Amino acid sequence: MRTPTTILLLVGAILFSGAGYVRSDASDHRYKEGDTVPLYANKVGPFHNPSETYRYFDLPFCIPEGVKEKKEALGEVLNGDRLVSAPYKLNFRDEKESEVYCNKKLSKEEVKQFRKAVEKDYYFQMYYDDLPIWGFIGKVDKDIKSDPSEFKYFLYKHIQFEILYNKDRVIEISARMDPHSLVDLTEDKEVDAEFMYTVKWKETETPFEKRMEKYSMSSSLPHHLEIHWFSIINSCVTVLLLTGFLATILMRVLKNDFMKYAQDEEAADDQEETGWKYIHGDVFRFPTHNSLFAASLGSGTQLFTLTIFIFMLALVGVFYPYNRGALFTALVVIYALTSGIAGYTSASFYCQLEGKSWVRNLLLTGCLFCGPLFLTFCFLNTVAITYTATAALPFGTIVVIVLIWTLVTSPLLVLGGIAGKNSKAEFQAPCRTTKYPREIPPLPWYRSAIPQMAMAGFLPFSAIYIELYYIFASVWGHRIYTIYSILFIVFIILIIVTAFITVALTYFQLAAEDHQWWWRSFLCGGSTGLFIYAYCLYYYYARSDMSGFMQTSFFFGYMACICYGFFLMLGTVGFRAALLFVRHIYRSIKCE
């Protein structure tokens, strides 16, 4: 058991040694009056389609001379960031009033392109000294008219920057579009446009260390916190009711069972051969498709470990707002470093299940989650390339990811598998397994797999569904989510409810003399992932304004992968809890 512990300690040391580096990634530059402060234009895109973003100069803005692309980290590229030097000169404490930076005659095609962008509510994003700036590129004047052909389309041509500074550091920046300085795009004709900008500087007492707090305050407002705490209380009540109910029922039932089975020598044959003790010779019979089962446990354990490490980094403040690409970088690195845990767990359990083809099992473990994720990525990346969107990964980034998988993930997976194979641990079964399996008696329909999965998934989902909206609005929208402590509490509640409901359903399954509980407990535990995917359908059609083939395919494609990951992770939690329970109750009776 030292191997997985060693791997966990190693991963933790690497991550927390790098945590300080990630946090200091925000610019700590000091400037003198007149110094150049880096300003990068990032991307543009429809406001309601967060995945459908394009390079800033894909729209026919004035392109300055010597445009330079910023060298980006892996996480920034995965996040769809494509930073280039912006056309504005915002030197430190250098004020400007209606400075013209470009005069341009827009052709008919450029007018059409801008009008289409304005119609779709295109916004732009920039970074000034690593502080984000947003704004819409234009507006639609509907003037209480219902006929879209009568709408008027305007392009903003004057942007007003207001920058706050504290001594020699930039603290805050905001951009406001001048509503009176517009270019009419309604008709298909050439238009003269004079683009200009204004810069105002104001001093503030806000320290540099707190300049990012502005972006996390929205999620910490009292009315938002009330909803979050209502979610926590709702979840806690669910947990208390569930655990109390199950504990009462199971303890009472098990107590009666133990008393009955303790007197089995005096009881009649028809009384002693009933219930879950009747199948003690079959309950530890290994499941079918043992290689797939072990691989699922290995992948689920890895994803559970990955989630814990992500929460640890979030709670120490690594994922502060607009730390570009930090989450994606952490996901890639931690997944690669924890692959040894998947290999060890899968191979050791597979050998306990008396499996012989451990190499094939290891290959299955490596592909079980990465395979569907890779196929989904290939399809969605092709869609993004077709749209020329920034979500399309460059060839170099794909090569880097393949190298990480080849040089880090795969070797660690193999090393973990070898360690698991050589652990020589035997499966601890309190009862001997008979040579031939008993026939399972006919069961009512509600004891079959699908109704049981529906019952098992509903309760854990009900404990997290309120928090899901805020997570979705952050991942697939423009909300900022920073209350990671509450999210971690919800995650712990999710794990507890999943474990308890799986244990209860496993007991009722065994009491009905159905000994095929291995896969059933895994499926019941993981069924919450199916409920989350069903919530995706509801969120897309009822709570969001997403549209278009690209955004739709990205949303449902990547959410399918995330829900599949939840299925594997929670399935592992459910099975582990059920295994502990089954071992406990059969260890408490005398098995022949």
From Swiss-Prot:
InterPro entries: EMP70, MFS_trans_sf. It is a multi-pass membrane protein. The chain crosses the membrane at residues 230-250, 303-323, 325-345, 363-383, 398-418, 453-473, 486-506, 522-542, 554-574. GO terms for cellular component: endosome; endosome membrane; extracellular region; Golgi apparatus; Golgi membrane; Golgi trans cisterna; trans-Golgi network. Pfam families: EMP70 (PF02990). A motif (Endoplasmic reticulum export signal) lies at residues 581-586. Its main location: membrane. Residues 251-302, 346-362, 419-452, 507-521, 575-592 are cytoplasmic. It is found in: Endosome membrane; Golgi apparatus membrane. Residues 1-24 form the signal peptide. Keywords: Endosome, Golgi apparatus, Membrane, Signal, Transmembrane, Transmembrane helix. A motif (Golgi retention signal) lies at residues 590-592. Residues 25-229, 324, 384-397, 474-485, 543-553 are lumenal. The keyword Membrane applies. The C-terminal KXD/E motif functions as a Golgi retention signal, certainly through the binding to the COP1 coatomer. Belongs to the nonaspanin (TM9SF) (TC 9.A.2) family. This is Transmembrane 9 superfamily member 2. It comes from Arabidopsis thaliana. The lineage of its organism: Eukaryota, Viridiplantae, Streptophyta, Embryophyta, Tracheophyta. The gene is TMN2.
